[in-house]
Amino acid sequence: MARIFITGSTDGLGRAAAQALIQKSHQVVLHARSSERAVALDDLAPWSAGVVIGDLSSATDTRNVASQVNALGRMDAVIHNAGAYSTKGRSPTPEGHPTIIAVNALAPYVLTALMARPRRLVYLSSGMHREGSSSLRDIDWSARRWSSSQAYSDSKLYLTALAFAVARRWPDVLSNAVDPGWVATKMGGASAPDDFEEGYLTQTWLAVSEAPAATVSGRYWHHRRPLPPAKEVDNPAFQDQLSARLADMTGVSLF
């Protein structure tokens, strides 16, 4: 059985993925943003391999999450499921970054760099990454007029490119991005039309399946089908420029 860490596992896709993996006797390490949010895991925690707590919008907390997971031992897979979408403006983090950018892009980058390297990495993307801006001059939105939807698209472009960069730079790791579709979660809303089950089962499939179709790297998946991502995602020059910018913003070097 595999050991899997899932960020953002108190609700939505992350919780569903955790439940599915626990039911198959995998060792799942859960994550909650705060002790208060961890109460939502009370029913799963006894069957899990541990619960780590930390707010991924905070650089300090994100580093601490990496330390907590490392203390539990090397994971076989990490599912970077946690995400944020805010319509309340830039919502700066303690370090001054927009919360959307911090949670959706900076935190997965830092966790990837600081956690013991797993065999598999799964990053939760979105079809909205195709509307992301390829300009990396104002990742922090310090000059642009704020747009939550554009910032979200940008963050998912960065995250998807990160998944492909890891696939290229770490050939011993299976790294993939997943578009779960527009599904009924707290973020997606109750009327979202896509298949919720396929949204989380694609994550778990990539995390643990030994099927030949799942043991590949550098792919963008939607409901267990590979799709072409935005052109920037598979561009080594863009990947390297993004990695350099994220290293500069976080003070953490990945490659």
Where are the predicted features?
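Conserved glycine-rich Rossmann-like NAD(P)H-binding loop of the short-chain dehydrogenase/reductase
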Residues: K24-A40
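Rossmann-fold cofactor-recognition segment
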Residues: A45-T60
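Conserved N-terminal Rossmann-fold NAD(P)-binding element of oxidoreductases
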Residues: I4-G8, H31
